Structure formats: structure tokens, C-alpha cells
Amino acid sequence: LKWKRTLWILWAANFSITAGTNLVIPFLPYYIEHLGVHQLEDLERWSGWVFSAQFVTSFLFQPLWGRIADKHGRKIMLLRAALGMCVVTTLMGFVTAPWQLLALRLLNGVFSGFISMAVSLQASITPTEYSGRALGLLQTGGIAGSLLGPLFGGVLAEAVGYRNVFLFTGGLFFIASLVVFFLVHEEKKTADTTSKAAKMDWATIKPILPVFVASFITNLGMMSIEPIVTVYTRTIYHGGHLELVAGLVVAITGFANLIGAPTLGRLGDRIGQRKTLLIAMSMSALAFLPQAWATGIVVLLLGRFLLGLFVGGMVPSLNVLVKKMAPPNLLATAYGFNTSSLFLGNLIGPLMGSHVAAAFGLRTVFYVTMAILLLDALFIWFNRHLGEQPEWEAD
């Protein structure tokens, strides 16, 4: 079947893009230091700016690329993202000052959007009854890349130097573009200008707002813990190999994602995406309790695993709900807004977590994030018509 073939092709491309994006993350502060920033406070400031820059421009540009994709096709937007990031990332290997790196990270965010376009393309060709498992499996490509990318990035940096890693990453993005160009086939459809779906435009996007809010809160919850999790690990673990244990605490959620995404994706196909989303969101919230109560490393690891398991199930459900509720002529636009919501969570989550930890203590972050997720679960609960046949389709 065409949708299954495309799924595996996009899985490989997603893996390449996400692995490449994460290859440079472990040594970004060291690279900035290599560019001449040596004072600790300045290094921390520049590292924060350079790391966050890509999320800012990605957040701003995703809906625009989605709108263009709805008019001109998703494949060309996949190529735009892969080739754009290929050129920009390669240029990062030649910078001589931190402001140049910052500018290129901002530009890289402008060109990003490969993952959301891949999801949009896959959603558009997959039968609705298989959407959960297909989008859940597609998500695992990105998860695998985000897990392996930092590991190989650190190894490569030691072996060939910082600058060559950027060149290698540009090569990965170029390979992804070749995969898309030669192996992904998108049918060109004649634009429907007579249906209510084609005319309503933005009015048909408004009912999907609860999904966008849930996407934002999903990443807000995950990212709020990231700035403090290694510090928190040190407060409850006093044995040897602290760095290894802290790395395991961070990575275990990703491994759980690999299990949760396809498993709960299939569950959503059986019992409905709204029910699955409610289960996953409620259980994700409760998974913060063992983390907050942990006095030993085993309980913390268990809580982190449960969190990754159920958060992994939230994203496929959210993606399927977007597919069901968005009119076909605005599907990529809707996924663009959904991706912007995820990036906004990436931006605000770490800021919220670090400020709450500084003001009220490390454990408070877990309780605050749990409360936010539970409130969002209530929000989804009261939106009882979420995922039902939309007005544009009924007409």
C-alpha cells in the first residue's frame, strides 16, 4: 500500500533530520567558548540565546509554511526545509563569532518544519482507521533521532572536531532531501474552490484550538523539567557515576516514548483519539507524583519512564485529531499551527521550570506541571465534541 511505503520513507527521513538537529546540541556551549566567549556568565547567556533562537523563528514561521504547502504541495516544503537547513547548518561550521552562530540558528528556524510537513503528508494519505498507528510509528523516527543524535554528536566532536560535525549534519540533511526527492510521491489534487471547507478558511481552524492548547501544554510539561532534572538527580542520588545516571534519567523518557507512541496510537484507532488523549494526559500528570516523592533513583526512573510512555501517546492522538478536524485544503496549515504550539511549549517550559525551582524549590516544579496537565485534561473532557464530524464535512 502506498501509505505504508511512504510511512517508512518518511520515518527514515525524519530520523535523519532529527538526528542531525540533535547532533550539535551537546557541544554548543563548548563551540561558543571556542568562538571567544570565556566568561562563565557570558557563556551561559550566549548558550541560552543560541539554543532558543531556532525555536523562536520556528514558532513564527510554521503556519506560513503550512499555508504554502496547502496551496503548492507538501513535498516541495519538505525539500525546502531539508535543503535550507542543509545550507545553513553547513555555514555554522565556518562562523568566527558567536553573533554569526546566533544569526544562523535564527535562520535555521525559518527553514525548519520538516517534521510537521512529514506528519501532514502522511496524515493526508493514510486511511482514518489507521491514522493513530501510522502517525505514532512516524513519531518514533524523530524520537530515535533525538536519542541517538546527542550521543553520536559527542563522539563525532571528539573524533573530528566541532566544525566538522556541522558539515556532517549538513550532509545528513542533504541525504534526507534526496530521499524525499526520489522516493516520496505526492498526488497533485485540483483545488476545491466551491465547497464550504474552501471558503470558510480560518473559521474552520478555530474549533481545533483546544488541540493546539493541548499540544502547547504537552511540551510545556516535558520541557519544564529539563533544566532541573539533572540537578534534582544529584539531590537524591549520592553514588558513583553521577553523569551516567543523570544521562539515564534524561534518556529513559525517550525510550519510553518509543513504546508509548505506536502502542497508544493503535489504542486511539480502536477507542477514539479523544479518549486516548484523556487517558494519556491524566496518566502523564500522575507520573509526576513518583518523581516529586522520589527519595531514591529507582523511583525517579520509574516516574520518568511512565511520563515518557504516556506523553508518547499524547502526540499521535493530537495529530490524528488535527487530521480529523481540519478541512483537507487547510490540513498543512493546521499542522503548522500545531507545530508552533509545540515550539511555544519548548520556549516557555524551561523558563517556567527554572523560575519555579528558583522561587519554590525543585520538587515544586513537578507539582505545578502536574496541575497544569490535569487542568488541560479537564479542558479536553469538557470539549466533548472534539474529534466529531466537523461542520465543513457535514455540509
Predicted regions and their residues:
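Juxtamembrane intracellular "pre-TM" segments in multi-pass secondary transporters
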Residues: L1-W3, H185-V213, D395
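Short amphipathic helix-loop junctions that connect adjacent transmembrane helices
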Residues: F27-E44, I228-L244
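Central cavity-lining transmembrane alpha-helices of secondary-active solute carriers
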Residues: W49-W65, A251-T263
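Conserved MFS/SLC helix-loop-helix module at the cytosolic interface between two early adjacent transmembrane helices
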Residues: F59-T96, G268-R274
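Structural signature of the two symmetry-related core transmembrane helices
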Residues: I76-L91, G170, K275-P290, M370
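Paired small-residue
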Residues: V88, W99-L107, A287, V298-L306
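Cytoplasmic helix-loop-helix junction between adjacent transmembrane helices
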Residues: L104-G142, V320-L321
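Helix-loop junctions on the cytosolic side of multi-pass membrane transporters
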Residues: V180-T193, W381-E393
